[in-house]
Amino acid sequence: LLSRGLGDVYKRQLLLKYPGTNCDAETERALRAAGFSTQIQPIATATPEHVAKSQLVVLGGGFSYGDYVTSGRLAQLETERFLGDALHRHHAGGGLLLGICNGFQILTKLGILPDSSLIDNKKERFECVWAKLVKVAKNSPFLQGLPDEFELPSAHAEGRLVTRPGDAEKYLAAGNVALQYVDNRDGCECSIAGLQDSTGRAMGLMPHPERFLLPRHHYDKDWAGNEDWGWGYFLFKSAFDALK
């Protein structure tokens, strides 16, 4: 079944791995299913050349460096050290950037996504739930294949998005909000579940698309959203289709 998503021409993708991230295998599997030629690269050995050869760069989920300072902070410093300029060149040159969960936290700290922070959930504890989402950014290259409402697994302790006063509303008006929660469990400002930059080529989201690749990954065995694929697959496939 997984081979059914493969295109005739592979597109290169770089998946950055940090100490403590734990979704690398699932994310690689989803990317390959969508058609990408995927390379998992530890951040300690990643080079600007790895980025330059890739059309999509993904920062995956987990607990980079154990989240010992704040989520994504140490990973951000290491990413800036090894790849900061390369990632900005990649983005400016038309490449795609995707941050999932911890990767979203890292992208906000790198300044690639609109200024914001992801802090402790409203309930001040780790929660693993399914999140119902609304697609806000209709022009996002990552969301074209998804319906207006869908759901994905979510698992984090620091996923409450906060901004400077009034900024969340500005992001919503400016088209920077990619996804919103239907049930805003984390207490995010404007119910924001995902942000994108002004071009749409960089996006971050807290829920995990790689964890809903196939219909059998859904909690309801009778889920009838799609016969062959879970909603997460279509996020990666949308990115694949968007690349020339």
Stretch-by-stretch model annotation:
Residues Y65-S140:
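Cysteine-nucleophile active-site neighborhood
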Residues I40-Q41:
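A structural preference for short, hydrophobic beta-strand core positions in alpha/beta folds
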